[in-house]
Amino acid sequence: MSAAPAYSEDKGGSAGPGEPEYGHDPASGGIFSSDYKRHDDLKEMLDTNKDSLKLEAMKRIVAMIARGKNASDLFPAVVKNVACKNIEVKKLVYVYLVRYAEEQQDLALLSISTFQRGLKDPNQLIRASALRVLSSIRVPIIVPIMMLAIKEAASDMSPYVRKTAAHAIPKLYSLDSDQKDQLIEVIEKLLADKTTLVAGSVVMAFEEVCPERIDLIHKNYRKLCNLLIDVEEWGQVVIISMLTRYARTQFLSPTQNESLLEENAEKAFYGSEEDEAKGAGSEETAAAAAPSRKPYVMDPDHRLLLRNTKPLLQSRSAAVVMAVAQLYFHLAPKAEVGVIAKALVRLLRSHSEVQYVVLQNVATMSIKRRGMFEPYLKSFYIRSTDPTQIKILKLEVLTNLANETNIPTVLREFQTYIRSMDKDFVAATIQAIGRCATNIGRVRDTCLNGLVQLLSNRDELVVAESVVVIKKLLQMQPAQHGEIIKHLAKLTDNIQVPMARASILWLIGEYCEHVPRIAPDVLRKMAKSFTAEEDIVKLQVINLAAKLYLTNSKQTKLLTQYVLSLAKYDQNYDIRDRARFTRQLIVPSEQGGALSRHAKKLFLAPKPAPVLESSFKDRDHFQLGSLSHLLNAKATGYQELPDWPEEAPDPSVRNVEVPEWTKCSNREKRKEKEKPFYSDSEGESGPTESADSDPESESESDSKSSSESGSGESSSESDNEDQDEDEEKGRGSESEQSEEDGKRKTKKKVPERKGEASSSDEGSDSSSSSSESEMTSESEEEQLEPASWSRKTPPSSKSAPATKEISLLDLEDFTPPSVQPVSPPAIVSTSLAADLEGLTLTDSTLVPSLLSPVSGVGRQELLHRVAGEGLAVDYTFSRQPFSGDPHMVSVHIHFSNSSDTPIKGLHVGTPKLPAGISIQEFPEIESLAPGESATAVMGINFCDSTQAANFQLCTQTRQFYVSIQPPVGELMAPVFMSENEFKKEQGKLMGMNEITEKLMLPDTCRSDHIVVQKVTATANLGRVPCGTSDEYRFAGRTLTGGSLVLLTLDARPAGAAQLTVNSEKMVIGTMLVKDVIQALTQ
């Protein structure tokens, strides 16, 4: 083979006779040269049938990428091997594709079906890599495929794949922000995941997509706090940052009553005699004010957060320590914030980059919490090896920590720093001395004298900076320092730094009455060199001339006119403008303007002394540790730190409902005894529980790998509550283990609720607070009624296994509505027709029932009676044509009022619908009396997609946000055709329009009756006559687009079968195959 010689040549060898030998790196193999023949050899190696050659080629290609070489021209040859059976080759192919898929989008799109198959690979690394490649293809046309892949991966048994799904969410959101509602549902589902591997990634996705949806965190707050210690380091940083913002909105400020407590303590210690002398009136006033000042009691969840983050101060990661430090600074009481000082000081031994960030934050903290870092003053002393930016930041911290006790030590340090060779550092030190003199009055004279001594320094920059600082200090006590002003005036001949010269001129002009003889002479010298001065100096010369003209016009009138004449023709616009303005103001014209009379007040008005403040003073409004705080400017994507609430929000929103869990488990155990058919199939637990299931449930987990959910329905709140409570209580006792078994069997039977029906009330805080007590007060008889209803509805329960895939994600509430439902007659009759369909002996007898709708799913909850404050709402897909529009899915909405008051004005509010989806609202229900039920019909055009229809269910007083998401089988209508027509249409839909999967039918699903029932319950398809007894054909069309959907099931002996779906809509075909296989294999 032609590739073999090149392959051995790459390994290196000796040169031929008479040729010089060249040494080369055997690792490179000559691959990294610009010789295109090398790449041709790699392409040949990738085209061979030998996995060993392919593996070697991929290793070299990945090595090229690692060394920064361009390997994009190999994309066609590499992408062909994505379907290679060798797992090691496939891994490296995906590594390559993740790197180049975004650059070679057109070629990547050609292999998109292969990537989709990779999502179902048994190896979790391949599934995750396939999802990473899909999310790297930044083409809007594949958004539906990406959404489907993310939903499937979110239900994957592997935590690593679910983590990758969380990473893909922000990528899809940045590509198409219209998918936000569906992505929020996936985020809500992943937030309920108990796996530490997923927690950080999903919180990052939450922060990117919907940081305002703080209600998604309520039920998962305690779980996140408890998992925090075990999450990977970057995940800890993200979670802590998010929980900081969450806590600022849900808890009261721990420092709100500190001033009041200090006043009371001082009063109790000193003012006992004064209190006795006070009149009764003052006592009454104090008594009236007392109820409004309640003592602060920390919320237990607030304490939980502080307690669980404190150990992370010992983390090896500087980012984690910094995150905990900012959390304590923003959330902890003053008495507890001090624990972060030692951890931050420890970080100062790290790299200079880490020191820079830490010192930025310490500088901000030390302004408000000076006492926190005072014991560690020596840790901020400057080393000669420190970079300049580190020195300046340490200087900032030392200045902030200076007080009357430690100022002698600090000033001695500053004296040493002034001798440094780093001029920027010396200038910052002089500024720091000026700030110390401003803040501590008793050392002001000492600092001023030291700065005056620096005026004789040989370094002009040191002298210039000293002049600027002296100018600011002299403004505080100008009358006492006339000699210093004279000394500065003498320096005008020597100092050439513009800022220093400008400062001296300003001082002389401002306090010219203290140096009446020197000031005119300085003006004379400056007039000589006016044209050669910098602009900032020229402006101060004009100011000096104006002030001297107003105070000593006899000596300076001509000089002032000369300076103004020079300035009038200066090149700088500002100087010319200032000269004209000043001339009109100080030199009276013939008319005598009104401003001229007040010129002295304008120029010689007393000015307040400048306040020397830290540049970090106003940075504390940014969240510490953020990029915005580092830059002192709001960065893109920065989330503002919320203000503390004035009143404590309802803490019960973070509670979990235990009673509902217990009752549900017991009821499902009773149902299991009555229905052994369902106990044969292995129970499925939610995707979040599979990661940490018991060893005893391994077989159960294995069965789940063939039926991973991809419907994208979000986990409900009650499931989140159950998981969190289960985590807190543990699983030690036998009773708890039995509850765990009940939970799995419960989730096995939930499939009756196939489509998604999530509801969130605007007043979720208040409704959830009463949910626990309401559920606890319900009697056992009330709980048995829904169970009996479930048993009395054969069509729903029989079709349940066919919908189990969707129900994995829809565990919002295990308790069906308490009101006895009345099924529409049409549903019952069609279900009976479906039952009879499997009993026919000839194909001709199938024709009358082919087009009759079959009830696929039972009632599904739209609004729980607790969240709806007594209003319970369910819905069913009736599979009957909607009278208003044949393209719409007919949905029956069932209302029930379990409250004590009538509910008035039931109607649909403003819908929030994705593009293409429309709703035909049901007529308004004027009133629903207590205990009564009502049914309405509405139509929804899902536009041949499984995107949820989100809308508001409104009454006269409340609005409830609800969502209906259809299973893929409800998006089509049955079609009648002959066998020949079926084969003809199937021949047109081959290639990429055909999806084939093999499966093994269980013993309970090998009769014609069961097979037909399960398929028609899963999808609204019509049966097509077939000449053979071991083959089943079904046909239908999508409601909106009218696209043909053909399904063929070829059953073989011993239970082996092959399922084929032909449809031009690949996404619908893929989802339908998955649903039907799951229904048939249960």
Curated annotation (Swiss-Prot):
Record keywords: Cytoplasmic vesicle, Epilepsy, Golgi apparatus, Membrane, Phosphoprotein, Protein transport, Transport
Chain spans, region Disordered: 1-30, 272-295, 666-802
Principal place of residence: membrane
Expressed in which tissues: Isoform 1 expression is specific to nervous system. Expressed in nerve terminal and cell body, and is associated with nerve-terminal vesicles. Expression seen in Purkinje cells, cortical neurons, neuroectodermal tumors and graded in cerebral cortex (deeper layers exhibit stronger expression). Isoform 2 is expressed at high levels in brain and testis.
InterPro entries (UniProt xref): AP3_beta (IPR026740), AP3B1/2_C (IPR056314), AP3B_C (IPR029390), AP_beta (IPR026739), ARM-like (IPR011989), ARM-type_fold (IPR016024), Clathrin/coatomer_adapt-like_N (IPR002553), Clathrin_app_Ig-like_sf (IPR013041)
Source domain of life: Eukaryota
UniProt GO cellular component terms: AP-3 adaptor complex; axon cytoplasm; clathrin-coated vesicle membrane; early endosome; Golgi apparatus; intracellular vesicle; presynapse
Keyword Cell cycle attached: no
SMART domains, alphabetized: AP3B1_C
Compositionally biased residues, Polar residues: 790-800
Composition skew (Basic and acidic residues), residue ranges: 666-677
Gene Ontology terms describing biological process: anterograde axonal transport; anterograde synaptic vesicle transport; clathrin-coated vesicle cargo loading, AP-3-mediated; intracellular protein transport; intracellular transport; synaptic vesicle coating; synaptic vesicle recycling
Stretches with biased composition (Acidic residues): 691-700, 716-727, 775-784
Protein topology in the membrane: Peripheral membrane protein
Subcellular location: Cytoplasmic vesicle, Clathrin-coated vesicle membrane; Golgi apparatus
Biased composition (Low complexity): 279-295, 704-715, 757-774
Covalent S-S links between cysteines: none
Modification sites for Phosphoserine: 272, 282
Entry's disease: Developmental and epileptic encephalopathy 48: A form of epileptic encephalopathy, a heterogeneous group of severe early-onset epilepsies characterized by refractory seizures, neurodevelopmental impairment, and poor prognosis. Development is normal prior to seizure onset, after which cognitive and motor delays become apparent. DEE48 is an autosomal recessive form characterized by onset of seizures in the first year of life. Affected individuals manifest global developmental delay, intellectual disability, absent speech, and poor, if any, motor development.
Function, as annotated: Subunit of non-clathrin- and clathrin-associated adaptor protein complex 3 (AP-3) that plays a role in protein sorting in the late-Golgi/trans-Golgi network (TGN) and/or endosomes. The AP complexes mediate both the recruitment of clathrin to membranes and the recognition of sorting signals within the cytosolic tails of transmembrane cargo molecules. AP-3 appears to be involved in the sorting of a subset of transmembrane proteins targeted to lysosomes and lysosome-related organelles.
Self-association and partners: AP-3 associates with the BLOC-1 complex. Adaptor protein complex 3 (AP-3) is a heterotetramer composed of two large adaptins (delta-type subunit AP3D1 and beta-type subunit AP3B1 or AP3B2), a medium adaptin (mu-type subunit AP3M1 or AP3M2) and a small adaptin (sigma-type subunit APS1 or AP3S2).
Family membership noted in the UniProt record: Belongs to the adaptor complexes large subunit family.
Protein name listed in UniProt: AP-3 complex subunit beta-2
Natural source organism: Homo sapiens
